Amino acid sequence: MTKKTQVGLIFGGNSSEYEVSITSAGNIYKAIDKDKFDVHPIWITNSGYVASEADSYKVLEEPGYMVEKNDKTANLSNLIELASRPELDVLFPIVHGNLGEDGVLQGLFRLIDKPFVGVDVLAAAVTMDKEFTKILAQRAGVPVAKWVSIKRYEYEDAKNQKLSYDWVSGQLGTSNLFVKPSNQGSSVGITHVTDDSNYAEALAEAFKYDDKVLVEEGIVGTEVETAVLGNDHPVVSGVGQIINADNTWYSYENKYSTESTTTLQIPAQIPAETAEKVQENALKIYQITECSGMARVDSMLRESDGEVIFNELNALPGFTNISMYPKLFEEAGISYPDLITRLIRLAEERYAHKKTLLRKHD
């Protein structure tokens, strides 16, 4: 009988995307092929404590469950103890947001010498920062929305021209703007701004989450997403379409609320040549950012000329019931359990390859 792979499923975290992580982890736990894998849930509470395995199972069953008492050793440093758990063959982090998909956890996994699902340290750090991702996309020849970057020291300078809506909208050539933290996901901290009335408030909201804020031109058109899977030879899924109600956008509420007015269309109702361009751009960005394992790439089809404009890359896409990433591969014939299996095998393949690299000069 083939020995099962022991998987450490890490989820939760002290992050604005905590609830998304819990939901994603629950879905992965339900869908994973239990004939091939034994799952060991590892819950990081929203207070930053690492819960026991018993409590970790409990929160997957009851997402609102809270640990009644944290013992004195229950803190984030417990993750280093993963190194002394030889029964764990591979780690599957589904910790969204800061500390989870920005290279921090990935660096820890490298230190403790464990294979892990998803992008490696460099790609995690780069793709968490929307500005750096846009710069690399431009380098790859992919069009991006125009933007102005504001650092905290600039924000704290009352005389800085970037604090003026009129100046920024003039630079970007439009009154239709999105103000967003550069390092954040799930549309957290993003505000749609169309005049001076809420620009200052939008900046204040975004700076709650990051020390760098982007003000981007709003692209009028169709929002589409595609999924990428693989290491050196990735495959790109078909294209899905985000259909928002009139005068709305794909906000956090529209992504995750039960009252969402947004629907997903798979496949997207767009011309074949446009879909091919979306896929081509997604692959270019995936490769130039040195992603591996998985990513979801979001784009806009500009209404005025049909140009495919890169929006952002999510290196740890959601696995909720309404998440586009697993749905796109399901449409391509890869079931949810098979997708999870492939992600784990990709992690093992990357780890095995890195073991062949020399660490010192002979």
From Swiss-Prot:
Its main location: cytoplasm. It comes from the Bacteria. Mg(2+) 2 binds at residues 312, 314. Its EC number is 6.3.2.4. Its cofactor is Mg(2+); Mn(2+). GO terms for cellular component: cytosol. It is found in: Cytoplasm. One of its GO terms (biological process) is regulation of cell shape. Gene3D superfamilies: 3.40.50.20, ATP-grasp fold, A domain, ATP-grasp fold, B domain. The keyword Manganese applies. It catalyses: 2 D-alanine + ATP = D-alanyl-D-alanine + ADP + phosphate + H(+). Pathway: Cell wall biogenesis; peptidoglycan biosynthesis. Keywords: ATP-binding, Cell shape, Cell wall biogenesis/degradation, Cytoplasm, Ligase, Magnesium, Manganese, Metal-binding, Nucleotide-binding, Peptidoglycan synthesis. Disulfide bonds: none annotated. Mg(2+) 1 binds at residues 298, 312. One of its GO terms (molecular function) is D-alanine-D-alanine ligase activity. ATP binds at residues 170-225. Residues 134-345 form the ATP-grasp domain. It is an enzyme of class 6 (ligase). Pfam families: Dala_Dala_lig_C, Dala_Dala_lig_N. InterPro entries: ATP-grasp, ATP_grasp_subdomain_1, D-Ala_lig_Van_CS, D_ala_D_ala, Dala_Dala_lig_C, Dala_Dala_lig_N, PreATP-grasp_dom_sf. Binds 2 magnesium or manganese ions per subunit. The keyword Cytoplasm applies. Belongs to the D-alanine--D-alanine ligase family. Cell wall formation. This is D-alanine--D-alanine ligase. It comes from Lactobacillus delbrueckii subsp. bulgaricus (strain ATCC 11842 / DSM 20081 / BCRC 10696 / JCM 1002 / NBRC 13953 / NCIMB 11778 / NCTC 12712 / WDCM 00102 / Lb 14). The lineage of its organism: Bacteria, Bacillati, Bacillota, Bacilli, Lactobacillales. The gene is ddl.
